[in-house]
Amino acid sequence: MKVLDLDMDYFMEVIAETPFSVTDRLEEEYYGESVWSENRIRSFLENNLGLSKDRRIEGRIVCGHNEAWFFWEELLADGKLSDPFEVVHVDSHADLGLGCASSDSLQSAMLTFPIESRRKIRDYEFNGKIEQINIGDYLLWGIAYRMISKLTYCANPNGSKNDYCWDTMKDFHEEWISNHPVTNYIQLKYNCEMDLPCYDSEEAYKNKYLAGAIKDPEIEFIIIPTIEDVHYDGEFNFVVMAQSPNYTPASADFIMDIIMEYIIEI
């Protein structure tokens, strides 16, 4: 099964790097004019994603993007969605844990747990505080839960496109992102005898860590860095779009009305 996971901030020329804790809308003066026009948005939805008002897809509009994850859990519980499933993530941010501590927490003894036990873990401790699944790491949690079988990141061309945790890549390797789609692989790993390597660790240390690590199945991770290379036929089982109010100006809210024309809200 395949789900479309949209974020409203993809339809902007200027990308905000707002701290997760900030809840205010973006300033109209700086961000308002960067929002795509209605015609451009409709063209992308219909010509790039293959959506149609004549064959609407069940879905939901949410506020914070981590609510997409809870929507999927709801669908799984109701038997409407089966896992693992493919995710097409159209966003200005990868939401794979960069800027969070979750990649270290998830690449831990948790990987030794049965899947049923993993899925009961909803938070972790970092610097004396309890952190929960958030807007910046919910996809990484989905991978750790083995909910996601394949992930395609349709990245905003104006963003960095490699805003994920390097240490979650298979063999600590990533293909360079330029102007064409790139295929990487995410593979969570844990070696109880060694600390997780950092980017500048020696290759010998990285190889030793990998040799003694337990490893989750690899997940194909495709990054599409341009709008022109986004090509889908609309064959999605479900659609979810996040408003992401702290990453969009209020003037962008008309996008939600447009999306509603292409989905059957559930």
Residue ranges and their predicted role:
Residues K2-I266:
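Conserved alpha-helical scaffold segments that buttress catalytic/binding sites
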